[in-house]
Amino acid sequence: MKTRTAQRLAAVACLAFAGTSWASDAPVVTDAWSRATPPGTTVGAAYMTIQGGKEADRLVDANSDRAAMVHLHSVEEKDGVSKMRAIDAVEIPAGQRVTLAPKSTHVMLMGLDGPLVAGQTFVVTLRFAKAGEQPVTVTVKPATATDDHAQHQH
């Protein structure tokens, strides 16, 4: 008797949620990473994918214990020269995916407390206008010759 009752309750629960959207209320951050930096380098960047929640939101700030200053940056290319500039926010449309990537929009880390070493992790806390603060674990990947972040101009 108990088994049948449990089965019926499970079936009712499944029906109750059948039409429910499983989209998160808040943005969901995945694949957060950074490139390793050589000793003496004081800047780095963090990249990630942000999946918008049920409502549009804006990434408005970030901070990390690993850096004295953390800004949101975009990269513009003009006459073959890439130039970074600080931006106030990153729009996160409802239900849409936004990718922060090299040579594009990213989280800029300035005044690093030491090199970012491949295989290590560190935390960047993102602040969204609606969803509030969200700590994100960033994995440091090996550096490559094709994207030396320190070569960009500010």
What are these regions (language model features)?
Residues 1-10:
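Bacterial N-terminal signal peptides that target proteins for export
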Residues 10-11, 152:
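Intrinsic structural disorder/low-complexity segments
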Residues 18-23:
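N-terminal signal peptide c-region/cleavage motif recognized by signal peptidases
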Residues 25-154:
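Compact, glycine-rich, soluble single-domain proteins
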